[in-house]
């Protein structure tokens, strides 16, 4: 993921039922900070040039954290979420991170079904 993906990623987040967003962390500046700190562990999935999935992943040097995994509704069930998760976990492993925490909101029933 790169900062230029922000608008498409943000629209995907907004269209995802149960996604918890806030004005600071999920702003363009917030994502820029996150990507600078975690340049190799955040991913998008594209279909014909359109972003259809995303995952934010970072770590504090000890434990990895997964945030904002989303796949456009008409692309769900095709393995995109699993591929994004595998990419994020692989990126953490390459940095020596072997523990991962997940942020999942109770109200996100679709997302919780995936996890």
Label each residue range with its predicted role.
Residues 32-44, 65:
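A short helix-loop-beta-strand connector motif used in the catalytic cores of GNAT acetyltransferases and
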Residues 44, 50-58, 65-70:
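Conserved beta-strand in the GNAT
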Residues 71, 77-90:
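Conserved acetyl-CoA-binding loop-helix of GNAT-fold acetyltransferases
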Residues 115:
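Conserved active-site tyrosine of GNAT-family acetyltransferases
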Residues 73, 102-112:
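Conserved beta-strand-loop-alpha-helix junction that forms the acyl-donor binding cleft
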Residues 58-67, 76, 95-98:
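A conserved beta-turn-beta hairpin within the catalytic core of GNAT-like acetyltransferases
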Residues 1-11:
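A short beta-loop-alpha structural element at the N-terminal edge
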């Amino acid at each position: 993921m790169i900062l230029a993906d922000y608008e498409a990623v943000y629209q995907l987040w907004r269209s995802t039922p149960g996604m918890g967003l806030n004005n600071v962390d999920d702003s363009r500046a917030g994502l820029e900070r996150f990507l600078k700190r975690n340049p190799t562990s955040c991913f998008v999935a594209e279909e014909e040039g359109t972003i259809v999935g995303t995952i934010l992943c970072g770590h504090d040097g000890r434990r990895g954290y997964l945030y904002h995994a989303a796949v456009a509704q008409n692309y769900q069930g095709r393995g995109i979420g699993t591929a994004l998760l595998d990419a994020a976990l692989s990126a953490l492993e390459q940095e020596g991170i072997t523990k991962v925490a997940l942020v999942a909101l109770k109200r996100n029933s679709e997302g919780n079904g995936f996890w």
